[in-house]
């Protein structure tokens, strides 16, 4: 393992922590420690950390809001850079929103309401960051990020800035080209439309109610665990296989919504991984459908 040293010298306004528990930054409240954790506050520090990692052959893991990931119980070696404090947002000419990758989707939705901008209401309850949402082409209730993204700024592994148009992002279901290039999203531009505040608020409230009625928001979870198989719904397949309430350690298939796995009693990442495997196995036996994970597993 390469010794990580002098990293404080390359960041100006970002905190550096050693052997930091990552469960504090995970929606599932699971995971071991980060060898080194950098709490990024600005784009320059992000670029410096990327260059430092590349030049010193150190593994770099980017973590946004920690909502669609499972973090290994063994933690993550190398550097973990958290973008949640990189959250500046502004309104540009032509109803374009510019924001950094660490902004939460709730903060983005609130900004849209404040400025009477529509078309992002679908994202109001997705518990993620803008960067993660673009990486996964997140969507809900009939909307997807690909419908509103104008362009995306990224850093290459060498720390060079690059811009992708919407078309170049190659968006598809829970996919963007960044999953192949392994580049790091820094800033996103959204092409919005003017709306009326009352209608936007009404839509957001409607979707939030639907979410709270159907989803197990009272427990820590990583959100929807599996991608939607073509022609099916993952939650329905799991429910039909009689797996609601299935528990491994402290992780459980939600009794409220079978597409979710919740932490009901100090679950570990290993509990989640074993529960995922068991559900995949039993759904395949029951319906012949192979469930593919939407959740990303970080660390070894």
Predicted feature locations:
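Short, well-ordered alpha-helical segments in soluble proteins
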Residues: 112, 130, 134-138, 153-156, ...
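Short acidic (Asp/Glu) patches
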Residues: 106, 136-138, 167-173
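Structural signature of FAD isoalloxazine-binding scaffolds in flavoprotein oxidoreductases
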Residues: 31-32, 37-43, 70-88, 135-166, ...
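Short, basic and Ser/Thr-rich N-terminal targeting/leader segments
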Residues: 56, 63-65, 148, 219-220, ...
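Phosphate/pyrophosphate- and phosphate-bearing ligand-binding catalytic cores of soluble enzymes
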Residues: 17-18, 155-157, 161-274, 278-282, ...
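A gly/ser-rich beta-alpha-beta helix-loop segment of oxidoreductase catalytic cores
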Residues: 113-150, 221
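Anion-binding (especially nucleotide phosphate/pyrophosphate-binding) glycine-rich loop
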Residues: 2-130
């Amino acid at each position: 393992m390469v010794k990580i040293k002098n990293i404080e010298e390359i960041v100006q306004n970002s905190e550096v922590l050693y052997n930091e528990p990552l469960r504090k930054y995970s929606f599932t409240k699971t995971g071991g420690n980060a060898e080194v954790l950098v709490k990024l506050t600005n784009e320059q520090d992000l670029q410096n950390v990327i260059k430092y990692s590349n030049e010193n052959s150190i593994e770099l893991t980017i973590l946004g809001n920690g909502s669609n990931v499972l973090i290994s119980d063994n933690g993550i070696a190398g550097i973990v850079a958290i973008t949640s404090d990189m959250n500046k947002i502004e309104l540009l000419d032509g109803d374009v929103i510019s924001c950094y990758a660490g902004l939460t989707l709730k903060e983005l939705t609130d900004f849209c309401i404040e400025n009477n901008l529509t078309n992002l209401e679908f994202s109001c309850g997705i518990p993620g960051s803008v960067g993660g949402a673009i990486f996964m082409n997140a969507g809900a209730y009939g909307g997807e990020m690909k419908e509103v993204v104008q362009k995306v700024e990224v850093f290459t592994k060498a720390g060079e800035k690059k811009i992708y148009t919407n078309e170049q992002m190659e968006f598809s279901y829970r996919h963007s080209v960044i999953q192949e290039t392994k580049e790091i999203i820094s800033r996103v531009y959204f092409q919005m439309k003017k709306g009326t505040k009352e209608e936007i608020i009404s839509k957001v409230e409607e979707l939030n109610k639907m979410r709270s009625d159907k989803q197990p928001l009272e427990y820590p979870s990583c959100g929807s665990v599996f991608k939607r198989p073509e022609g099916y719904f993952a939650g329905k397949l799991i429910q039909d296989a009689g797996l609601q309430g299935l528990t491994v350690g402290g992780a459980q298939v939600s009794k409220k919504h079978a597409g979710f796995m919740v932490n009901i009693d100090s679950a570990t990442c290993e509990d989640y991984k074993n529960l995922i495997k068991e559900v995949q196995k039993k759904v395949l036996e029951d319906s012949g459908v192979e469930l593919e994970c939407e959740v990303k597993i970080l660390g070894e």
